[in-house]
């Protein structure tokens, strides 16, 4: 992405509020009985920070519609682009469609 004006986003965030919402998905230890952990979706916000996303289950959808495992190393931070950032960047940054699948090994 090439944004020439380094202050491009300033007017969008000036006097804005901020929300930090921590979410923890604990390991599944029992048979999920057809439960869906998180169906395919894009996040509505600017970005989603995924700390500790080094376990299996998170998948992102590529431009061909295929699902790819998204696994970070333990010392890495994964960042999902949200719908708002996609819109504000005129879709130069794409909102990440992702899901969380339940793996048989998890329980």
Where are these regions (language model features)?
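Conserved small/polar residues in nucleotide/adenosyl-binding loops
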Residues: 1-5
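Catalytic core of Fe(II)/2-oxoglutarate
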Residues: 8-9, 35, 50-107
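Short catalytic-site patches enriched in acidic/histidine residues
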Residues: 14-56
């Amino acid at each position: 992405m090439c944004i020439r004006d380094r202050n491009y986003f300033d007017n969008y965030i000036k006097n804005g509020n901020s929300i930090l919402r921590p979410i923890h998905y604990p390991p599944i230890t029992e048979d999920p009985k057809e439960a869906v952990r998180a169906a395919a979706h894009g996040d509505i916000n600017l970005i989603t920070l995924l700390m500790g996303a080094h376990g299996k289950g998170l998948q992102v959808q590529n431009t061909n519609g295929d699902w790819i495992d998204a696994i970070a190393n333990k010392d890495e931070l994964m960042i999902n682009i949200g719908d708002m950032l996609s819109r504000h960047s005129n879709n130069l940054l794409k909102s990440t469609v992702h899901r969380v699948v339940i793996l048989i090994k998890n329980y």
